[in-house]
């Protein structure tokens, strides 16, 4: 009866608390002049929920309330099954269970409630713990959950040390008066251990020695308040004595300091913290956790199972520019130490960790790992597509220079400036390539103007969109042939077309003939093809074995393009069934596209230009040679004659070189000699062998010079000194010319014109005064 009254008072306590708080709040509101701040308390109903409720989920458990008058207040819970089985409505405090509960598995849940400001997550009130109990009915006798229980106790434990707990399940709630209460009794081994009504087995002696007896087997009996027992109301408990683990790990130093570069890899080792544990190795099971400065999203502490050290590792990349130093506290504890062995100093050891992040020269960081640009093909106006951008993540904030590193086979048509601008040196052709890929590198510019060795990369993709710039071309699978006796309407061949441009879903080709006078007709098909059929028939191989049929193919692009293609149709002999029996094979002839014609014209123009260039160079070479030869002629422009007494003004007689050059103009020997020149008269025959050979040689050389188109006039005549054995005039020197007794007649020199005036005066008898000198 006392238990019933106690439980009833606990149930009513929150209600009285709620009324008392209302009264306090009313008093606070009525006293506007008071500046005293009243304490605000948590208020909620005691929460119970029955197991295996049949109604749909979720099930309402209770309501969290508080006297905080903040409209931005929000409730949150944590603890056992918080936010999994139990969830709270953040704004009104209603708690719901999202799973059907089973009291036989868990009878109660301990949770903690918080109330925070949802704007800044600041706590408005201290957290408070509460329990959600699962109730059931009393309809079963107690049954042990297992037939054999195992327990252990440290050796030499004091009297009453808890060893283990046995559990017998009963549908009744042992905490509620009036329901069946399970009690336990040891029927074997009660001289060493005792059991209480909750099923906890404790030591009955303080001198249990593991070395004397390492294990005990006892039998426990369970019954309810009515004394109901069943066949499964007894269980065996095996208790083993273990070595004592009565010491907690302790940090060797109150603080640890580590320095790591910011480019440390995720999962790399930052440092190790060491603890001391004087227990045996099998008792060392240190656990590390964060206490202050919660950086568990940045670092993790893993215990080394062999050395018991705590290894600190980063869980994500570090950034010196964002956080240069981390400071937090960690604790080391051993959850396996029995609470009965707690010693002064507590079960926790705390140490302060300082991690200093050092700066590392990092490569530039692109704003994106991949850039994509689209450009219309053959557009001469587009020179710049856009730009890529990267920045220096370090504190120096250096300038960045961009460069192209790698490119696809066609990527040379895309360039990158130092500032990251993507440029096109010339329009792109989608038919040549529809996609251009390049890799852009970013490097920092150092203070001395050099580029940093570290660089980062980004991909640039240039997509070329199509325009209608290619005319369709004719496609047919085989050589077209027609029988002489083909009937009108006979289909000769089905033709189709192809287009290098993209064909839109609504694209189509139009076929037509250039003339209606042929013996063929064209019919378009719905599938973008056309049939070539016989129009009138009555072909005659004797008249024409080959028919050339021009076909015009147009697309529906913008602008519309077309091409003329020629079908070469052979007329063949056929049998009565229409099978070909004899037909000359002809090479397929189709129209030449505009691109092919342009290529042909370019080749022809190139050949002509090369030939013209060669001719020009040859003429220039001749001009240079002629300049040199004129210099030689100018040197020999004067014929100088020396004799022993001096010739006076007659020693040098000038003559005009242009007169000599005019003898043969443009390489053609003039047929009419100017009046100023006398025709050369051959001297009469002379039996003297020396004079004849000299005359013949000079004449031959003169004729060769006159007929040589490649030599200039001043190269044609030379002074030859003939020293043959039978030469009569052995020398042209004036020392002998005057006293020569030769009977050779040199008067013919007067007939050779002014060019030979000096020779005529030296060797001739009478100069011709009619010559114009």
Curated annotation (Swiss-Prot):
Gene: CDH5
The protein's name: Cadherin-5
Xref: CDD domains: Cadherin_repeat (cd11304)
Signal peptide stretch: 1-18
Extracellular-side positions: 41-595
Annotated Ca(2+) 2 binding sites: 51, 104, 136-137, 139, 172
Proregion positions: 19-40
Bilayer topology: Single-pass type I membrane protein
Location(s) in or outside the cell: Cell junction, Adherens junction; Cell membrane; Cytoplasm
PROSITE patterns found in the cross-reference section: CADHERIN_1, CADHERIN_2
Domain of life from the UniProt record: Eukaryota
Lineage: Eukaryota, Metazoa, Chordata, Craniata, Vertebrata
Cellular component per GO, a single term: cytoplasm
């Amino acid at each position: 009866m006392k238990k019933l009254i106690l439980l009833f008072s606990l149930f009513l306590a929150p209600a009285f608390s709620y009324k008392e708080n209302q009264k306090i709040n009313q008093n606070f509101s009525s006293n506007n002049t008071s500046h005293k701040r009243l304490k605000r308390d948590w208020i909620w109903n005691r929460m119970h929920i029955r197991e295996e409720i049949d109604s749909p989920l979720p099930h309402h458990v209770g309501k969290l309330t508080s006297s905080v008058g903040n409209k931005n207040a929000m409730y949150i819970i944590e603890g056992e099954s918080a936010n999994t089985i139990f969830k709270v409505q953040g704004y009104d405090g209603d708690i719901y269970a999202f799973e059907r509960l089973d009291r036989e598995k868990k009878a109660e849940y301990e949770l903690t409630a918080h109330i925070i400001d949802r704007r800044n997550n600041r706590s408005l009130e201290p957290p408070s713990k509460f329990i959600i109990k699962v109730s059931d009915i009393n309809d079963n006798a107690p049954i042990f959950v297992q037939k054999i229980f195992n327990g252990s106790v440290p050796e030499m434990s004091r009297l009453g040390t808890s060893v283990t707990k046995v559990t017998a399940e009963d549908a009744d709630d042992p905490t509620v008066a009036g329901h069946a209460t399970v009690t336990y009794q040891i029927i074997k081994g009660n001289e060493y251990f005792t059991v209480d009504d909750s099923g906890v087995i404790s030591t009955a002696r303080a001198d249990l020695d593991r070395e004397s007896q390492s294990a005990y087997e006892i039998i426990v009996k369970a019954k309810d308040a009515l004394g109901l027992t069943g066949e499964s109301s007894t269980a065996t408990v095996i208790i083993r004595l273990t070595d004592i683990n009565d010491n907690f790990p302790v940090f060797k130093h109150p603080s640890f300091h580590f320095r790591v570069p910011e480019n440390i890899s995720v999962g790399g080792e930052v440092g190790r913290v060491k603890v001391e544990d004087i227990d045996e190795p099998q008792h060392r099971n240190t656990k590390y956790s964060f206490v202050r400065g919660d950086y568990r999203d940045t670092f993790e502490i893993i215990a080394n199972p062999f050395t018991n050290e705590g290894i600190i590792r980063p869980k994500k990349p570090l950034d010196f520019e964002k956080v240069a130093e981390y400071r937090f506290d960690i604790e080391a504890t051993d959850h396996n130490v029995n609470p009965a062995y707690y010693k002064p100093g507590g079960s926790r050891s705390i140490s302060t960790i300082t991690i200093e992040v050092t700066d590392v020269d990092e490569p530039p960081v692109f704003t994106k790992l991949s850039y994509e640009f689209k450009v219309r093909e053959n557009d001469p106006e587009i020179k710049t597509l856009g730009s890529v951008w990267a920045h220096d993540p370090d504190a120096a904030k250096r300038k960045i220079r961009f460069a192209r590193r790698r490119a696809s086979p066609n990527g040379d048509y895309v360039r990158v400036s130092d500032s990251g601008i993507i440029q096109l040196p010339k329009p792109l052709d989608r038919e040549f390539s529809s996609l251009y890929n390049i890799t852009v590198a970013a490097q920092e510019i150092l203070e001395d103007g050099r580029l940093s060795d570290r660089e980062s990369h980004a991909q640039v993709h240039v997509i070329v969109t199509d325009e209608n710039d290619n005319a369709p071309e004719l496609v047919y699978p085989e050589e077209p042939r027609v029988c002489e006796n083909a009937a009108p309407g006979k289909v000769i061949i089905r033709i189709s077309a192809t287009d290098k441009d993209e064909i839109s879903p609504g694209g189509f080709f139009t076929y037509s003939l250039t003339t209606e006078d042929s013996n063929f007709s064209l019919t378009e098909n719905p599938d973008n093809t056309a049939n070539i059929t016989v129009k009138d028939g009555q072909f005659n191989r004797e008249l024409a074995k080959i028919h050339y049929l021009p076909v015009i193919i147009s697309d529906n692009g913008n602008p519309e393009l077309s091409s003329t293609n020629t079908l070469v149709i052979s007329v063949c002999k056929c049998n009565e069934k229409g099978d070909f029996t004899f037909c000359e094979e002809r090479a397929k002839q189709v129209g030449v596209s505009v691109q092919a014609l342009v290529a042909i014209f370019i080749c022809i123009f190139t050949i002509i230009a090369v030939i013209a260039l060669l001719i020009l160079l040859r003429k220039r070479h001749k001009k240079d040679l002629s300049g040199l030869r004129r210099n030689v002629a100018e040197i020999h422009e004067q014929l100088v004659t020396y004799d022993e007494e001096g010739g006076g003004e007659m020693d040098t007689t000038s003559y005009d070189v242009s007169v000599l050059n005019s003898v043969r103009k443009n390489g053609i020997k003039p047929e009419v000699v100017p009046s100023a020149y006398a025709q050369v008269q051959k001297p009469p025959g002379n039996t003297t062998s020396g004079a004849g050979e000299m005359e013949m040689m000079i004449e031959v050389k003169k004729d060769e010079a006159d007929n040589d188109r490649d030599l200039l006039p001043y190269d044609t005549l030379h002074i030859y000194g003939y020293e043959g054995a039978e030469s009569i005039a052995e020398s042209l020197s004036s020392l002998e010319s005057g006293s020569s007794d030769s009977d050779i007649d040199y008067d013919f020199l007067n007939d050779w014109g002014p060019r030979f005036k000096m020779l005529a005066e030296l060797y001739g008898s009478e100069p011709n005064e009619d010559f114009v000198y």
